[in-house]
């Protein structure tokens, strides 16, 4: 159930204690995932869609596909994978996004991700930041579709779960009509059938990552034309979708939509997704119900010495547009950071909401 503690002890994934990664295989067996749909997903967002964010979003929607933050293949292969990509089984379905350009290393990272129980492995070919470009990661790879195809083929050979690609419609001075179709044709020939497309070009020089999310114009019709011309491919629309309503309108003619900042800043937009998108029953009926459903998760993680702010920061926009929302944000922002902060901070923030609701009545 949403919010219930349902967690495998990550200590079993200790690489040093268990050579050959049998623990990951055990983890995979214990985190099996049912069939899932990409009709709606929440985008991978660095510093935002961590495991605590995903646990909160899962309280609001059982069906929406959730994504990890991007993890680079070197970090997964040579670092502390349990710390980096471990997750709570209650978050499923969850996809792992990888960044990299070495087919052999990406294949190994994909295998590790699959052993952890992820439902999908996604390759990042859309991030425009200078930092990832220097590692030959992200949107710069749109200029190397053959290499991306090699990466995808290697990853698909290593795992038996779907491997997908998230990309832009082009970079710099490329003609999006040519670059997108050519890129998709080359990469799909390597085996992947699913492309999540941020409907903007990426400018690799001269724009910051933030500007690259806003400045280049959106071209939703191009993505719809791609789907019409390549009906056998699964095409997911991403970029600038401001709400579920907006996404459902612009996503007509493609296979699914991916919400990014809208889902994070106003998470209640996910609360009607199961009914509207998947024809299922919504798991919570009010924002207060969502808080209470998340409370057991908060309590469990607090007992693991996780800082309250690490979790409640993802809830700041829950009451957006409601009386008392400012007080809710202020209390959580100011007091959840304090040493030893516990659930009493959450209760204080809820009490402030109640006072403002009464005053507004």
Language model: regions and residue ranges:
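Active-site-proximal loop/turn and secondary-structure-junction residues that shape catalytic pockets
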Residues: 72, 100, 127-129, 169-173, ...
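Non-cysteine beta-strand/loop elements that form the S-adenosyl-L-methionine
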Residues: 68, 120-129, 190-201, 258-262
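Alpha/beta catalytic cores of nucleotide-metabolism and tRNA/nucleoside-modifying enzymes
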Residues: 27-32, 36, 40-46, 150-153, ...
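Glycine-rich, positively charged N-terminal anion/phosphate-binding segment
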Residues: 27-34, 45-119
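Conserved, mostly hydrophobic/aromatic
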Residues: 42, 57, 69, 96, ...
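Glycine-rich tight-turn/loop motif centered on a GG-T
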Residues: 130-147, 176-178, 206-218, 277-281
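Active-site beta->alpha loop and helix N-cap motifs at the rims of alpha/beta catalytic domains
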Residues: 93-164, 172-176
């Amino acid at each position: 159930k949403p919010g219930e503690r349902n967690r495998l002890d990550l200590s079993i994934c200790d690489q040093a204690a268990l050579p050959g990664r049998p623990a990951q295989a055990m983890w995979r067996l214990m985190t099996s995932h049912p069939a899932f749909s990409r009709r709606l997903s929440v985008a991978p967002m660095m510093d935002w869609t961590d495991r605590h964010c995903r646990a909160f979003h899962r309280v609001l929607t059982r069906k929406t596909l959730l994504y990890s933050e991007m993890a680079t293949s070197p970090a997964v292969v040579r670092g502390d994978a349990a710390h980096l990509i471990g997750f709570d089984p209650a978050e499923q379905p969850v996809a792992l996004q990888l960044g990299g350009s070495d087919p052999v290393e990406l294949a190994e990272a994909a295998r590790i991700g699959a052993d952890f129980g992820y439902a999908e492995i996604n390759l990042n070919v859309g991030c425009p930041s200078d930092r990832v470009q220097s590692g030959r990661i992200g949107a710069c790879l749109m200029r190397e579709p053959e290499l991306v195809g090699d990466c995808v083929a290697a990853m698909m050979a290593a795992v038996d779960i779907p491997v997908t690609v998230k990309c832009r419609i082009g970079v710099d001075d490329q003609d999006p009509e040519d670059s997108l179709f050519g890129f998709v044709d080359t990469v799909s020939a390597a085996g992947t059938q699913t492309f999540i497309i941020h409907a903007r070009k990426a400018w690799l020089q001269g724009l910051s990552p933030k500007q690259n999310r806003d400045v280049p114009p959106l071209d939703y019709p191009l993505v719809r034309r791609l789907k019409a011309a390549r009906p056998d491919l699964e095409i997911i629309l991403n970029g600038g979708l401001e709400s579920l309503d907006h996404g459902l309108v612009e996503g007509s003619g493609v296979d699914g939509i991916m919400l990014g900042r809208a889902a994070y800043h106003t998470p209640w937009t996910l609360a009607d997704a199961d009914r509207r998108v998947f024809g299922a029953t919504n798991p919570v009926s009010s924002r207060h119900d969502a808080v209470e459903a998340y409370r057991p998760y908060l309590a469990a993680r607090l007992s693991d010495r996780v800082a309250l702010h690490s979790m409640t920061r993802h809830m700041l926009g829950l009451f957006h547009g409601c009386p008392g929302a400012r007080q809710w944000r202020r209390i959580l922002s100011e007091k959840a950071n304090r040493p030893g902060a516990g659930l009493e901070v959450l209760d204080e923030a809820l009490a402030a909401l109640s006072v403002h609701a009464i005053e507004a009545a």
